[in-house]
């Protein structure tokens, strides 16, 4: 069982202490103040980057260089000398990129990046005793690991595989030449994503730096105008303002709900020994709902930073309005109204789902669902609670798929039946996610077992019975069209 850090160490920071007076004034841990300050500075820098370093005014080399320098400054401000881990990993993997053969470049990069990340996860927990509440260097290291492995696989696709062996998406994203050192550093360490992500594709990033990003996306959706130079350049301001409003609301909800419904309530003596079964399920749902706004805040703010810089355009919707969701990491409305486990996971931590698809789900020849869950758990860290969550997610995913394939079609014959089905499946989905994700925030073995014992392991038992006794109706779409999000569990 992972040792929990002492309370006095749970919020310590390794970064700058210049905002310590503000931290004391607000009553918010310094590491979190540094994180938010860096993201707000990044937002300001993003506006400046889009206006004053527009591709029409600055060369790609200048944009790459400034994006990298700002990113390095922000990560050092937040994490101090621990930022060296990011620089070491990026430089090591660039060495792999330029020296390894294209037939093995993806394998070597994957094992070096994941190996280094795992060693850092172990050291920060078992040696340095950093708590889960500490905003430390492992977060950026996780994002960099995604980027390193994504790029390595895409270079392998572009240089080491035949075009006919690639799926349509792999062909679109294949990288046909190894990146220069400046491009590599900029892609991994740029100020927009180095603190909070998300992972993005190398071709999209380079197109953004070179000023081809928006035009490329418009041409992908067959935008018909007088020519390439006459294509419009939509403003991201509407999307940025909307996302900043969501960010502010998420922050207020987090500050309110996390204090009213702390995770520790799930191991409280009253909850475990005195509350009735239905009360336990209700409080489990409420506590897990209260834990979500912090993710909404961090991911939506990161999305706004990219959009403010002009990155994240994704074409036009059916009404002809600009879409700025290329790098969005979640869809809050679809999460909160999801009527299936699959739908929920498809809209949570979207870019990590895309990464899992790229490096695991579409690549492995056996047991893609199980191996994707295990990779996701390993990427998150070595707390036992992560593995409880992801291993619980496997039977829940399989059981949900079996129920849907066997019964859903019976409820589509009338509107009333469909509404009833949607209401029931919404309630079951939200409860199943809360049950499955609880160990993720509890971390250790003892509180996880205590929680599951208090609710009699009911979902584990139900899922196993469904898998054992419901007839299997195989659903076998093409490998390239399978979504990893249907097998990916809720991530941090």
Swiss-Prot record:
Reactions that this protein is recorded to catalyse: a 1-acyl-sn-glycero-3-phosphoethanolamine + an acyl-CoA = a 1,2-diacyl-sn-glycero-3-phosphoethanolamine + CoA; a 1-acyl-sn-glycero-3-phospho-L-serine + an acyl-CoA = a 1,2-diacyl-sn-glycero-3-phospho-L-serine + CoA; a 1-acyl-sn-glycero-3-phosphocholine + an acyl-CoA = a 1,2-diacyl-sn-glycero-3-phosphocholine + CoA; a 1-O-(1Z-alkenyl)-sn-glycero-3-phosphoethanolamine + (9Z)-octadecenoyl-CoA = 1-O-(1Z)-alkenyl-2-(9Z)-octadecenoyl-sn-glycero-3-phosphoethanolamine + CoA
Keyword Metal-binding attached: no
Active site: 349, 380
Residues with Phosphoserine modification: 486
Recorded metabolic or biological pathway in which this protein acts: Lipid metabolism; phospholipid metabolism
Protein's UniProt keywords contain Transferase: yes
EC number(s) given by UniProt: 2.3.1.-, 2.3.1.23, 2.3.1.n7, 2.3.1.n6
Recorded superkingdom: Eukaryota
Protein's job: Acyltransferase which catalyzes the transfer of an acyl group from an acyl-CoA towards a lysophospholipid producing a phospholipid and participates in the reacylation step of the phospholipid remodeling pathway also known as the Lands cycle. Acts on lysophosphatidylserine (1-acyl-2-hydroxy-sn-glycero-3-phospho-L-serine or LPS) and lysophosphatidylethanolamine (1-acyl-sn-glycero-3-phosphoethanolamine or LPE), and to a lesser extend lysophosphatidylcholine. Prefers oleoyl-CoA as the acyl donor and 1-oleoyl-LPE as acceptor. May play a role in neurite outgrowth during neuronal differentiation.
Family: Belongs to the membrane-bound acyltransferase family.
Protein name: Membrane-bound glycerophospholipid O-acyltransferase 1
Gene: Mboat1
């Amino acid at each position: 069982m992972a040792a929990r850090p002492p309370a006095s160490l749970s919020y310590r920071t390794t970064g700058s202490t210049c905002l310590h007076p503000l931290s004391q004034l607000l009553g918010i841990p310094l590491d979190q103040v540094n994180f938010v300050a860096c993201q707000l500075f990044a937002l300001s820098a993003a506006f400046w980057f889009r206006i004053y370093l527009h591709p029409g005014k600055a060369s790609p080399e200048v944009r790459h260089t400034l994006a990298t320098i700002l990113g390095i400054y922000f990560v050092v401000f937040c994490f101090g000398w621990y930022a060296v881990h990011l620089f070491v990993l990026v430089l090591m993997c660039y060495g792999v990129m330029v020296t390894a053969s294209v037939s093995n470049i993806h394998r070597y990069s994957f094992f070096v990046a994941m190996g280094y990340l795992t060693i850092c996860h172990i050291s920060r927990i078992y040696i340095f005793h950093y708590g889960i509440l500490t905003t430390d260097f492992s977060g950026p290291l996780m994002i960099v690991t995604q980027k390193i492995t994504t790029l390595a696989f895409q270079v392998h696709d572009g240089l080491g595989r035949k075009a006919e062996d690639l799926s349509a998406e792999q062909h679109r994203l294949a990288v046909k030449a190894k990146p220069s050192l400046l491009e590599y550093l900029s892609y991994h360490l740029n100020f927009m994503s180095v603190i909070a992500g998300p992972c993005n594709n190398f071709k999209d990033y380079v197109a953004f730096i070179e000023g081809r990003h928006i035009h490329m996306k418009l041409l992908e959706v067959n935008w018909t105008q007088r020519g390439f130079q006459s294509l419009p350049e939509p403003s991201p301001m509407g999307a940025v303002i909307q996302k900043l409003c969501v960010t502010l609301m998420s922050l207020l909800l987090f500050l309110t709900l996390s204090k009213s419904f702390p995770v520790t309530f799930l191991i409280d003596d009253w909850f475990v020994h005195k509350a009735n079964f239905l009360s336990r399920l209700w409080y489990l749902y409420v506590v897990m709902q209260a834990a979500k706004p912090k993710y909404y805040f961090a991911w939506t703010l990161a999305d706004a930073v990219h959009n403010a810089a002009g990155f994240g355009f994704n074409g036009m919707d059916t009404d002809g309005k600009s879409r700025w969701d290329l790098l969005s990491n979640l869809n809050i409305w679809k999460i909160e109204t999801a009527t299936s486990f699959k739908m929920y996971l498809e809209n949570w931590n979207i870019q990590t789902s895309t990464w899992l698809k790229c490096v695991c789900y579409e690549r492995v020849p056996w047991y893609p669902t199980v191996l994707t869950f295990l990779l996701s758990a390993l990427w998150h860290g070595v707390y036992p609670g992560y593995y409880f969550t992801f291993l619980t997610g496997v039977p829940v995913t399989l059981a949900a798929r079996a129920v849907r394939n066997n019964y859903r079609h019976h409820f589509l014959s009338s509107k009333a039946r469909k509404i009833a089905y949607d209401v029931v499946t919404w309630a079951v989905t939200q409860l199943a996610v809360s049950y499955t994700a609880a160990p993720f925030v509890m971390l250790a073995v003892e509180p996880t077992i205590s929680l599951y014992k208090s609710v009699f392991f009911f979902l584990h038992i139900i899922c196993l019975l469904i898998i054992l006794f419901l007839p299997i109706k195989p659903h076998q779409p093409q490998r390239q069209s399978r979504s990893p999000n249907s097998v990916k569990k809720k991530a941090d």
